[in-house]
Amino acid sequence: MSAAPHLAPGADPAMIRNFCIIAHIDHGKSTLADRMLGVTGVVEARNMRAQYLDRMDIERERGITIKAQNVRLPWRAQDGQDYILHLIDTPGHVDFSYEVSRSLAACEGAVLLVDAAQGIEAQTLANLYLAIENDLTIVPVLNKIDLPAAQPEKYAEEIAAIIGCDPGDVLRVSGKTGQGVPELLNEIVRQVPAPVGNPAGPARAMIFDSVYDIYRGVITYVRVIDGTLTTRDRCLMMSTGASHETLEVGVISPDPHPTGSLSVGEVGYVIPGVKDVRQARVGDTVTTTRNPATEMLGGYRDPLPMVYSGLYPIDGSEYPALREALDKLQLNDAALTYEPETSAALGFGFRCGFLGLLHLEIVRERLEREFNLTLISTAPNVVYRVVMEDLSEVTVTNPSDWPGGKIAEVYEPVVDAMLLLPTDFVGAVMELCQGRRGVLKGMDYLSTDRVELKYTLPLGEIIFDFFDALKSRTRGYASLDYEPAGEQLADLVKVDILLQGETVDAFSAIVHKEKAYSYGVAMTTKLRELIPRQQFEVPIQAAIGSRIIARENIRAIRKDVLAKCYGGDITRKRKLLEKQKEGKKRMKTIGRVEVPQEAFIAALSTDTGKSATSK
């Protein structure tokens, strides 16, 4: 395979087509990519396996794509010419939209893939708008036409109405059987424009992904915009100004093949001899020290964390291992941020920032699976901006940082949410959104039986169990997509949980004033069941500042001190009972309640478990 013409360096840009596939989860994107690998012959039938491009175990198990992948495909089109197609496989999930935006910037065209049995979903629409913003050519395709439940005519009209094409132009393929895939590849060659760039100018390439390899350091996946990158040049990262020796340059088809150089329009990999992934940031521009470019490629923003959660090792001695594991994960995941923090209840750990709940869950699962750590994560929360009465500002990512004293106003992040659902469920979903302090912004009927609702919702209301509630109210038919939309003034308070009069920081939460009471009652009731009974009565209280809003008591265990008395004088028994009473009284004033680790895990996991399983 290495001698194949499509792997030769220095391809003519006019013969290159760079495209990506936009689809919702489960619409068959990875399966279609598998068929393309088979049809173009880069993977022999005997080596084929399902979801060939999804390398991580978690990706295969959940059937989702997390990291963007790319592969170089040779294709002889109808005109008899040999073309080179670069497929950049993108994730479909809302949490990984920054991966999508980078992949789109590396393409000229996008295949809009829609399940012929389900129709367009919210995330497909969101990514479609992103692609249109980036001026990509859209090739509409209906997948899974072999399904008995497929309704290609109906959904072709729906797609045509949204992107403004003729329903007859919507291609019909089956990723499972391979039907229609050669026609799709021919359409990509015909419709997607060839890449343009200056082959003689200074080299400029955009990093759209990077992975960490234990033997060779950071491997960056790049799309060359201008000039040529070769192994002879030292490469220069424009955002950091650091230069490195280029160890290897090549293409992926679908396994890496060194070619020695990459020229205009080509997609491949560059291995700069870097051990620290922060030196090779995704979205950065690579140039050469010999003939450096003067300006960076635009359009990249650092991904900002939306959700914060504390990660703590259950065994305190695993703290250094957790730090090392997070360092390694950050090499692959530019959006993960973390800083050390301590908790009186949970010991040493890290406050981590994530893009959303699925991101949080996947990072946690990778830490546990790839690094053999056992972790406990605190309830997720968002970033609040608190303005004090003296006009000083405090940014709060952790409930324990909530300032005391006089607070003038609190701002919370809001999102513009787009919900797609069957018309039968509009009432139930509107009721749900209003209960979550949502404001209706608009309502569009895509067809007679599908409606798109636009809401502005506080992010803090979505990250708990909103997705679960939405799915259960619509029998699983609704889909959700959201994007940040600034912040709004909110009436928020911090609810503390007190055990025996002492605050337990791990259970504190920032909630809306109207929901503070129900949170307090739920938490105190749950802890009463989880904390073992003591020799003395333990009050569990929920408080806002110094005002108690809910209380439960853990009843004391009574030891039978009269067991050893057989008959005898009543005063003897009374003396023992009085002595026990005194002891209990003293214990109540000086006794401490030890919350067992299991109770912490159960309380926090049931609190966040509703949301963690939601996606």
Swiss-Prot record:
Gene3D superfamilies: 3.30.70.240, Elongation factor 4, C-terminal domain, Elongation Factor G (Translational Gtpase), domain 3, P-loop containing nucleotide triphosphate hydrolases, Translation factors. The keyword Cell membrane applies. It is found in: Cell membrane. Its main location: membrane. GO terms for cellular component: plasma membrane. GO terms for molecular function: GTP binding; GTPase activity; ribosome binding; translation elongation factor activity. InterPro entries: EF-4, EFG_III/V, EFG_V-like, EFTu-like_2, G_TR_CS, LepA_C_sf, LepA_CTD, LepA_IV. One of its GO terms (biological process) is positive regulation of translation. GTP binds at residues 26-31, 143-146. It catalyses: GTP + H2O = GDP + phosphate + H(+). It is a peripheral membrane protein. Keywords: Cell membrane, GTP-binding, Hydrolase, Membrane, Nucleotide-binding, Protein biosynthesis. Pfam families: EFG_C (PF00679), GTP_EFTU (PF00009), GTP_EFTU_D2 (PF03144), LepA_C (PF06421). Signal peptide: none annotated. Residues 14-196 form the tr-type G domain. It comes from the Bacteria. Its EC number is 3.6.5.n1. It is an enzyme of class 3 (hydrolase). Required for accurate and efficient protein synthesis under certain stress conditions. May act as a fidelity factor of the translation reaction, by catalyzing a one-codon backward translocation of tRNAs on improperly translocated ribosomes. Back-translocation proceeds from a post-translocation (POST) complex to a pre-translocation (PRE) complex, thus giving elongation factor G a second chance to translocate the tRNAs correctly. Binds to ribosomes in a GTP-dependent manner. Belongs to the TRAFAC class translation factor GTPase superfamily. Classic translation factor GTPase family. LepA subfamily. This is Elongation factor 4. It comes from Frankia alni (strain DSM 45986 / CECT 9034 / ACN14a).
